[in-house]
Design a protein with these regions (language model features):
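Positively charged, polyanion-binding regions of nucleic-acid-associated proteins
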Residues: 85-92
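C-terminal regulatory/interaction regions
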Residues: 92-140
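Metallo-beta-lactamase
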Residues: 4-85
């Protein structure tokens, strides 16, 4: 059992079975967008650490059990993309609302660029994720 530093929430836990190389974690979302409630930077660090572990199967907090790469690659790609976009918005002095509007405009033009993972609940959580990340990265 491992307690993680701030990531998805402020109290994430996981269980790892050495014998079967199975990892249970609420930090991992499969087939649906992650909802950021604590720290995207902390969560990404946690996922990077999980990526280095000798895991065969991940039982996510949200979604079906899958192989490690199937679980981690989409969420890490999304986090990297979101962090990069929001940092650019900060550099260009774009407000949180203007950031969301910019992404909304792109979504209308080409939804595959905005939600390439094809996640469920994307519209419900993506824009709150932008706002959360915007606030977190404001103090970098």
């Amino acid at each position: 059992i491992k307690a993680w530093k701030s990531g998805h929430t402020d109290n994430d836990l996981s269980v790892y079975d050495l014998k079967t190389k199975t990892f249970w974690s609420e930090n991992i979302f499969v087939e649906r967008i992650p909802s950021i409630r604590a720290s995207i930077l902390g969560w990404k660090r946690n996922l990077d650490e999980i990526q280095k572990m000798d895991i065969d199967l991940i039982v996510p907090g949200h979604g079906s059990a899958v192989k490690k790469d199937v679980a981690l690659k989409p969420i890490l790609k999304y986090f990297t993309r979101l962090i990069s976009q929001v940092r650019k918005f900060h550099q260009d002095n774009v407000s949180p609302q203007e950031s969301i509007n910019s992404i909304l405009q792109r979504e209308i033009l080409d939804s595959k660029k905005v939600n390439p993972e094809g996640w469920a609940l994307f519209t419900e959580y993506h824009y709150s994720n932008i706002t959360k990340v915007y606030t977190e990265l404001e103090w970098e």
